[in-house]
Amino acid sequence: MNFHEYQSKQLLAEYGIPVPAGKVASTPDEAVEVANSLGKGPWMVKAQIHAGGRGKAGGVKFCKTTDDVKAAADKMLGTKMSTYQTAGVELPVNLVLVTTAGEIVKELYLSILVDRGTKTITYIASSEGGVEIEQVAAETPELIHSLNVDFVEGVQGYHGRDFGFKLGLNAKQAGQFASIMVNLYRLFNDKDLALVEINPLAILDDGNLYALDGKFDSDDNAAFRQKALVAMRDKTQEDETEVTASELDINYVTMDGNIGCMVNGAGLAMATMDVIKLNGGEPANFLDVGGGANKQRVIEAFKLILSSDKVEGIFVNIFGGIVRCDMIAEGIIAAVKEVGVKVPVVVRLEGTNVEEGKQLLRDSGMAIIPADNINDGAKKVVEAVKNAA
């Protein structure tokens, strides 16, 4: 789950990490009220969407007067915004964050994440903040520093001070940096986060460090014990079909192609998409119907796939271990009848009760195309889509 900047800053402040004073507003007049409550300007007005790169898209404005604040908020609120991170998708701007604005002396980068390669929690820091860390890694990798956290020792003050000096900070600032690192570690663990990125972590004209922007990503597997974080979810920022899928507990990700996929198991689902592409097709989605799939779940999966008008064919690829192929076949038949599927459907079944499942499909009288294996199925669905065009 992703978070808005203002939500990230609330959590950072809760854990003693300094952020500029600010508050969200939903109307231009509210934005002016917030600005006045923060004292004398200047101020920053920032559109709240689940994406970075807002500045280049006109979503971050420096304002010297309250008239500027009102004009900036009026221009942003109620619009839709896309950035280089949204892949052309426009996200609604329902809120703006109004904060105090100090003069930036230096921008740094700091993040904490789970490094699956080293199987540790890892810090990444750079003296080059305010830009994409991938760009820094490609052009000046020597400016990136990392620390793998020992689970027994945890993060200590000397780790942060050492990091701070590597980034060119003075003694006072290195001490602040150490405090931020220690508090960030507590936040990361307490809230079951997968990523916290502070970019930039800036030195302002008062000589102190502030988190000017924060990007959070939580571990959805821990949602059951992080009710406060779940309550922060903004579904207006998410793909509508993906929201519906999450409510049905179906793993679904929208993609750009025209061949819908219904598969059980994440690994098989990814392999299915790969084989479709190898055969000249483009998957329209990732959909893992799960190992405990039943008839109703299959029907709901078909509805999700066909909610996109881009889908011109469907490939059902099921390996029945826990799930029974005959039950999947019943679900496919029911779905085709109930949903009124008008695109080619290719089905590959293997595993438990596979012969019973295939017989049900044959006896259904429906134009369901059988496949012997994953490659055969991918070829047939790509061909069927081309022939139907």
Swiss-Prot record:
Binds 1 Mg(2+) ion per subunit. SUPFAM superfamilies: Glutathione synthetase ATP-binding domain-like (SSF56059), Succinyl-CoA synthetase domains (SSF52210). Its EC number is 6.2.1.5. The keyword Kinase does not apply. One of its GO terms (molecular function) is magnesium ion binding. Belongs to the succinate/malate CoA ligase beta subunit family. This is Succinate--CoA ligase [ADP-forming] subunit beta. It comes from Xanthomonas campestris pv. campestris (strain 8004). The gene is sucC.
